[in-house]
Amino acid sequence: MSSLEREKASVFHSWSAQSTISPLMVASAEGVWVTLEDGTRLLDFSSQLVNTNIGHQHPAVVSAIQEQAGVLTTIAPQHGYQSRYRAAELILDRSFDGAAKVFFTNGGTEAVEHAVRMARLHTGRPKVLSTYRSYHGATATSINLTGDHRRWANDTASAGVVHFFGPFLYRSAFYATTEAQECERALAHPEATIAFEGPSTIAAIILETVPGTAGI
């Protein structure tokens, strides 16, 4: 069997009809370049999942991973460790005013789940607002928060999520023809949504400041 055949036979790919996929078989990557198993070099315009923004195999990142792996590879959350609090301090230095602590998770979707739980716990309110054409993850609550069609198969409509239209002048939901019109109408829409849903029922609004998977 070829590498591609073995990949398709053993790996379940997310967001894909398994019988129709034909993934590129990557051998290595460096900087902005990805090299396939057949030697083809491709310029990685998508930065993988829009996350390798300093390039592949950055020497400083590789060195730090190697150094840490030689000392400690995992630690239970009930323990303290220097690398973790140093990372937290760096994040807090660059975060918003008033940020006091960092809660580490395994990824973005888990971060969203915890953020929603915290918002509901501290407000006592059930609803969270999110925009259409958004992506917030693929676990229970985060996939309901996601605002594109990929959520449909798993959207139970019972997660206390309310969607609204965000600004999108290219295909405006508000029939706007200028940026000023789009901004004004896009701000009025969630305001009306909040009023009709009941302000006292809303725990949080989740937004992508820069649309990623469902926008770029």
Please place each PLM-identified region on the residue numbering:
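Active-site-adjacent loop/helix segments that line or gate small-molecule/cofactor pockets in enzymes
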Residues: M1-V32
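PLP-dependent aminotransferase-class I/II
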Residues: Y135-V210
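Glycine-rich loop-to-alpha-helix module at the N-terminal edge of alpha/beta enzyme cores
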Residues: R41-L129, G137
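Residue-level signal for well-ordered, solvent-exposed loop/turn and beta-edge residues enriched
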Residues: T40-R41, I216
